[in-house]
Amino acid sequence: MPRSSQSAQLAAAAAAGVGLGIIATLSFQRGARRVDDDEDGEDDHGAARARVWRSIGGAVTAAQLYVGDKLGLYASLKFLCETAYAATPEDLAFHAHIDERWAREWLAQQAAAGFVKLLPGTGDSRLRFRLKRAYADVLADPNHEEYDISLVRMVPALVQRARTALPEAFRSGRGVAYDDEDISRAIDDAHAKHIRLVLLPVVLGKLGSIVGRLERGGAIADLGCGGGNLVIALARRFPLAKVVGFEVSDTALAVARKRLA
């Protein structure tokens, strides 16, 4: 689709009531330009504004990534696009059990951000969107090696800390507690992928004689074990070794204990 036609359709979607998310995303995409630190001039206000707007646009988009992940919208889109190539807001609303108006808002924002494609020739009353296979793998398939949305789950918690805990922490010098369900889950899910795809098949193979010693016994300490994924994986890989995890987060420890039960 020509860029002018695509822009016109996105504008039509915005006019239909998609709200601040798409407007901010469009402004971010059109106004920001790539800026390298070495190219920033001392008085380059354009570069400074572009960097600010990239950050704002990223925050707005991350919030909608979080919503899509939490409500299973990407998983629903993946299923719909695999079975019918594309989906309407009505389709997504029905499959994901959400309100149609909010499905429309979210899809339009996702199209503006480039995560889904607004198909050409779709009128305002029958907008059709497609989640491409690569994006479906990254956003909606936890078993795929390219799956990579886990860490977005901690973004709202980190932003909330910026509103509440961090200003006082900066003034007082006191720390901020690590314990948070979303943060723990995000890190835990991200680690699970790398344990499965990198640590077990790649890293262990580079440890030489250490692997042999662990196969005969020995002890392993996982400092900052989180939800226990690595502790469990290593215990299974080295059943004769003693594997102990250490963690300060009560939330993460509760997950680890549940997995070990």
Residue ranges and their predicted role:
Residues S7-F28:
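Hydrophobic alpha-helical topogenic segments used for membrane insertion/localization
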Residues D43, R49-L71, A75-S76, R104, ...:
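Conserved Class I S-adenosyl-L-methionine-dependent methyltransferase catalytic core
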Residues T83-F94:
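Short acidic, hydrophobic short linear motifs in intrinsically disordered regions
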Residues L223:
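Conserved beta-strand/loop positions that form the S-adenosyl-L-methionine
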Residues G227-F238:
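Conserved SAM-binding loop of SAM-dependent methyltransferases across substrates and taxa
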Residues K242-E247:
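Conserved SAM-binding motif I beta-strand of class I
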Residues S249-T251:
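Conserved SAM/SAH-binding beta-strand->alpha-helix loop
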Residues A256-R257:
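Conserved SAM-binding loop
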